[in-house]
């Protein structure tokens, strides 16, 4: 499908990963924004939002999430009464509601306050460290891997290529010594001196550790670190110290109000005891991967049930938003939790532990997609090039580009480990699948070709990533840059003879495939089929070696 004998690589890890990016890109391209309105009012300098009744779709989604939580052994979310007004789909509907409540008093109907605890963030495995570094410092997964590998070689951090966030019990007695070695963090480690360190099951669990434990400092004083290394070491050190601090205690307040039978709601959060949050500075500056928008501290005034008074209502125009493009951080998470991309429960379970790829190989997979010019970077966003998009669209075998194939193989490999599945049978199945895929490609007579994207890579003055590469048609070379470090200039691609401006082969209408469909002259059983570069026999997988170059008939 390539041009000028260009090799287009696929693989059970790189192709599903590319498909994630392409499918997200197509979702964004095909997204049609919908207009809606929000009714809000301000009472005592606090903004309340009208409660909107959930749609049938939202209720089904919540039920599915609860099922997944139960299956994972977690407590499902408590079902709430589905009340409130219907979604405001038109400005006229919103204006009528606004007039209905404008001159009536706002009354507080309920005030609830709940206290809760928040445990420290988990220690780092390789993927979570790569995610955090991409979010905080815009480091690529490959850059982070090289940095943490360097820290390991300098003996200031433990083995990096790990997929667990836990420590084994035998590490616990060593922790006081490690903390003592973190001299630059004495402000945080001194309060722990002479105390019995917390030993949480969320940190120390032998059953969650195999060959290596989570990434932590070794206790050796870091010297001669680069700025990038120091930043990454700081993340690791603070995470490690935080797990020995008490939970953060907070209070969540929910206040309900009503105007003319239309219910309103607001929530607030107050930090009671910061606990481990002091390690990360301000309460909102903790280093957690996924933070809810309403997680910042928001202290509400003291409301009393039954109070009422004037308010200022307003109507706000809103538009539904498309999904966000993948960044390296969100792509790594998607690769890790690929179980969400398949419907089969057994396959999902197999993927929970392994995802797409392994922690130690995911950075290399993303780099491969860059090197193949399947993706490029625009700021932090990963964008599929025309080559990447067309490659995914041209692959007919869904298994090759879905997380399901990885799940099937991982599941069977686990069964082989347990001696409940035959390894020889697994190999035969792989051979059969490969034969079928190859036959499918050989019998594809569509003459479709993929636009080969070339890029000129430039390095900026400080040696960091340059501008994002732009695509260029095979017959229209354009000089542009791509965010890789090495400065290399790509040669323009010359279209193959007969190629159109779009890269598709133009065939003469008078040409006919005179041999295609005839009985194979070598084995006498199969029929001649048209391959990519020559004619072959349909019985090739059974050993027939017939081959005839194009134009020699």
Can you say where each PLM-predicted feature lies in the sequence?
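Beta-strand/loop nucleic-acid-binding surfaces
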Residues: 50-53
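Basic, low-complexity terminal or inter-domain segments flanking catalytic cores
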Residues: 30, 74-81, 94, 112, ...
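Metal- or metallocofactor-binding catalytic centers and their adjacent structured scaffolds
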Residues: 69-71, 76-122, 130
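Eukaryotic nuclear/nucleolar intrinsically disordered, charge-dense low-complexity regions
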Residues: 154-157
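A conserved hydrophobic secondary-structure block that centers on an alpha-helix together
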Residues: 136-140
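C-terminal or mid-to-C-terminal helical accessory/interaction module adjacent to the motor/catalytic core
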Residues: 1-43, 114-117
């Amino acid at each position: 499908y390539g041009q000028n004998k260009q090799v287009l690589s696929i693989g059970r890890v790189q192709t599903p990963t590319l498909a994630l990016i392409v499918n997200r890109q197509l979702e964004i391209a095909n997204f049609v924004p919908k207009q809606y309105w929000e009714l809000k009012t301000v009472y005592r300098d606090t903004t309340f939002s009208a409660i909107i009744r959930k749609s049938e779709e939202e209720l089904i989604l919540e039920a599915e999430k609860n099922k997944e939580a139960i299956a994972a052994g977690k407590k499902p979310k408590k079902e709430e009464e589905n009340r409130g007004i219907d979604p405001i789909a038109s400005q006229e509907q919103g204006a009528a509601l606004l007039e209905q409540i404008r001159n009536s008093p706002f009354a507080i109907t309920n005030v609830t306050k709940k206290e809760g605890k928040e445990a420290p963030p988990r220690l780092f495995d390789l993927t979570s460290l790569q995610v955090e570094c991409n979010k905080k410092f815009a480091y690529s997964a490959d850059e982070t891997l090289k940095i943490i590998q360097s820290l390991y070689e300098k003996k200031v951090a433990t083995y990096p290529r790990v997929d667990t966030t836990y420590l084994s019990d035998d590490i616990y007695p060593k922790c006081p010594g490690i903390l003592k070695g973190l001299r630059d963090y004495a402000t945080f480690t001194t309060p722990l001196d002479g105390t019995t360190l917390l030993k949480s099951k969320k940190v120390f669990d032998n059953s969650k550790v195999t060959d290596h434990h989570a990434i932590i400092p070794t206790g050796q004083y870091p010297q001669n670190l680069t700025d990038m290394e120091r930043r990454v070491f700081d993340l690791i050190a603070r995470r490690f110290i935080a797990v020995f601090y008490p939970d953060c205690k907070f209070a969540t307040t929910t206040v309900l109000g009503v105007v003319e039978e239309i219910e309103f709601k607001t929530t607030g959060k107050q930090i009671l005891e910061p606990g481990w949050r002091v390690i990360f500075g301000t309460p909102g500056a903790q280093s957690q991967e996924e933070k809810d928008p309403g997680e910042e501290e928001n202290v509400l005034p003291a409301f009393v049930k039954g109070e009422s008074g004037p308010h200022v209502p307003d109507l706000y125009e809103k538009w539904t938003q498309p999904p966000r493009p993948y960044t390296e951080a969100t792509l790594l998470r998607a690769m890790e939790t690929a179980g969400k991309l398949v419907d089969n429960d057994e396959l999902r379970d197999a993927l929970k532990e392994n995802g797409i790829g392994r922690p130690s190989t995911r950075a290399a997979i993303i780099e491969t997609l860059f090197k193949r010019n399947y993706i490029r970077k625009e700021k932090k966003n990963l964008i599929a090039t025309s080559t990447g998009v067309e490659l995914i669209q041209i692959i007919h075998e869904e298994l090759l580009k879905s997380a399901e194939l990885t799940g099937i193989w991982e599941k069977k490999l686990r069964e082989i480990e347990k001696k409940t599945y035959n390894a020889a049978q697994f190999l035969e199945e792989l051979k059969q699948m490969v034969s079928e895929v190859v036959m499918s490609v050989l019998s594809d007579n569509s003459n479709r070709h993929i636009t080969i994207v070339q890029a000129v890579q430039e390095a900026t003055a400080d040696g960091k990533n340059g501008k994002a590469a732009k695509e260029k048609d095979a017959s229209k070379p354009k000089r542009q840059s791509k965010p890789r470090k090495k400065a290399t200039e790509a040669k323009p691609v010359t279209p193959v003879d007969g190629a159109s401006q779009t890269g598709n082969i133009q065939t003469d209408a008078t040409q006919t495939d005179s041999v295609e469909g005839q009985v194979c002259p070598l084995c006498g059983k199969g029929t001649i089929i048209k391959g990519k570069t020559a004619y072959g026999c349909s019985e090739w997988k059974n050993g027939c070696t017939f081959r005839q170059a194009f134009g020699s008939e």
